[in-house]
Amino acid sequence: MLDYRQKIDALITKIEKARTAYSRHHIVKIVAVSKNASPEAIQHYYNCSQRAFGENKVQDLKTKMHSLEHLPLEWHMIGSLQENKINALLSLKPALLHSLDSLKLALKIEKRCEILGVNLNALLQVNSAYEESKSGVVPEEALEIYSQISETCKHLKLKGLMCIGAHTDDEKEIEKSFITTKKLFDQIKNASVLSMGMSDDFELAIACGANLLRIGSFLFKE
């Protein structure tokens, strides 16, 4: 059985070391990625004071939210959003969508938000590793698309950027993708959230300025 307290304490220790090396004033938030976890495991981490959880699929988000509705949890949608799932996602009112990966998707979401009279907080996903397997806008177009969404999608509240580190064992390449995203983030007025870093690379992400981490296997793997 997982020792939940031991796991989260080990994570926080690593985060604190990386955070204070970057800046004593830097604040880092953890989103526990619970896509393969049971509601019981989430409950255990809630008992350890973890509040934000993320899911990859809308249906899984719905299931977990309903089974844990008695807890004051903050839910994030971190996986790619299919257009036919927009209504379902909006009905769940997540705290944040991390994976807004195109202007086209933004316009589709905006249209549904307007009809339903709701807003959605989101991050623009940047494919800073230039990998075909990853979603997101290319860095060269990111600022222009961010601006377009901000101006044309009044119900979509952009809060910053998200990226997934390069899929490689070469730490320099991973760092490069994080630095690329951080440089873009620094050019966006009023951007507050930089979602970078997962279980294998969160310390490097913090060193590059991440303030929101998406941690799955570190917390939930046996």
Swiss-Prot record:
HAMAP family: PLP_homeostasis. This is Pyridoxal phosphate homeostasis protein. GO terms for cellular component: cytoplasm. One of its GO terms (molecular function) is pyridoxal phosphate binding. InterPro entries: Ala_racemase_N, PLP-binding_barrel, PyrdxlP_homeostasis. The modification N6-(pyridoxal phosphate)lysine is found at K35. NCBIfam families: YggS family pyridoxal phosphate-dependent enzyme. Pyridoxal 5'-phosphate (PLP)-binding protein, which is involved in PLP homeostasis. Belongs to the pyridoxal phosphate-binding protein YggS/PROSC family. Keywords: Pyridoxal phosphate. The keyword Cytoplasm does not apply.
